[in-house]
Amino acid sequence: MNDTISWSTLAVILAAGQGTRMRSPLPKVMHPVGNRPLLGHVLAAVEAAGIEQVAVVLGAGGPMVADYLHQAAPSARLFTQHEQLGTAHALLAARGALQAHEQGCVLVLFGDSPLITSQTLSRLRQALIDGAAVAVAGFHSGQPGPYGRLLVEDGHLRAIREAKDASAEELQVSFCNGGVMGLRADSCLWLLERIGKQNAQGEYYLTDVVAVANSAGLPVTAVEVEEDDVRGVNDREQLLAAERIYRQRQANL
C-alpha cells in the first residue's frame, strides 16, 4: 500500500447551487450553522484532513461567497459555473484545477453539507490509495425512500440507481448515495468528459461517473459513512436539523 502522505489531494467544493428553497437573499452556502457559514464547516473538515489544495465552484451569489473565501481560504482557487447544467458540469468548471492536479486524489464535496468530517474525507482518500478509481460515500438509512441506491456486488459498486428508476427489488436496498466522492486524479478528467446528458433534465450528473468507470473496467467502490456526515441543507427545516446535530456533536466533545 502506498503511504497516504505521498498522495497529493485536491478538494473541489461545489457551491454553485441557487438555494431557492431557502427563501433568502443570502447565498445558500452562507447560511450559518453554529455561527459559521455552511461552507466554512466544509473548509474546516478539508483543513483537518490535511488537504492543502482547494478549489471552489461558485454560481449564484458568487461575489459574496468569493469575498468570504478570500478571508477564510485565501489559497483556494475559485471557479464559476455560469449555467446550472448538473453536478458533473459544475465539477468540470474547475477544469483548470483538475488539469494542474495530474496525480493523487480528487475529493468532490458540497458546500451545503456542514456536517462532513475529516474522517470521512480520509476514508475516501484511502479507498483511492487502495486501488479504486472512484470511491462513493454511502450510508444506511431506515427510510431510504427518495435516496439513490448504491448497488454493490462482491465488494464493487456496480451502479447508483435513482429511486424513481429503481426496481421493486432495488428499492429494498438501504445503502444510499451520500453524494460525496473521490476520484483518482489520473483518470478524473477522462471519466468526466465521457458523461453525457441523456436524461430527463438534460444535465450532466456526477453520479454517472460510476457507470462510465465500470464500462471502462475501472474499479469502483463504496465507502460507508454516517448519514449525518453527508446530510445536505436545502431548506430551512434541514438547516435547523443541521444546527441540532452540530450542537449535539459539540456537547459530546
Residue ranges and their predicted role:
Residues 19-23, 64, 145:
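Short N-terminal binding/cap micro-motifs at the start of the first secondary-structure element
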Residues 2-7, 174-253:
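Conserved alpha/beta core of the MobA/IspD/sugar-nucleotide pyrophosphorylase nucleotidyltransferase superfamily
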Residues 7-33, 49, 72:
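Glycine-rich N-terminal loop/short-helix segment of MobA-like nucleotidyltransferase
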Residues 22, 65-69, 124, 192, ...:
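Hydrophobic packing residues within well-ordered alpha-helices of enzyme cores
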